[in-house]
């Protein structure tokens, strides 16, 4: 799902583990995302509720065209959360039920005033 969504390459997959890399990146190069299969996985509850299964990680993807990105994510197999909290963000669920966000923040992130710590 994430390889299709991001246009990245599956650089390794053995059924239990999968590693994605940005196009043209050698295995082990960054950026990359590694996933582990978990047969006992339960999708997190979203929005979060006390004493309920919580997400272990959260991915936000900055995009140029929010509505186009939502349409593409749906095409790849995502679903849109029924509850949304902002016009500039869309909460989506991957096919396993894990939430991720698409956000119209790419111009901010790419500006000279933005820095990651």
What are the roles of these predicted feature ranges?
Residues 8-58, 70-95, 105-117:
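Vicinal oxygen chelate
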Residues 60-62:
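Short hydrophobic/aromatic beta-strand micro-patches
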């Amino acid at each position: 799902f994430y390889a299709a969504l991001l246009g990245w390459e599956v650089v390794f997959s053995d059924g239990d583990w999968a590693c994605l890399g940005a196009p043209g990146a050698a295995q082990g190069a960054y950026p990359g995302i590694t996933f582990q299969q978990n047969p006992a996985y339960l999708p997190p509850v979203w929005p979060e509720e006390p004493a309920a299964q919580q997400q272990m990680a959260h991915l936000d993807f900055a995009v140029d065209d929010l509505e186009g990105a939502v349409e593409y994510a749906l095409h790849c197999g995502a679903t849109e959360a029924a509850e949304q909290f902002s016009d500039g963000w869309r909460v989506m669920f991957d096919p396993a039920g894990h939430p991720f966000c698409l956000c119209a923040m790419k111009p901010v992130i790419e500006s000279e005033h933005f820095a990651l710590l």
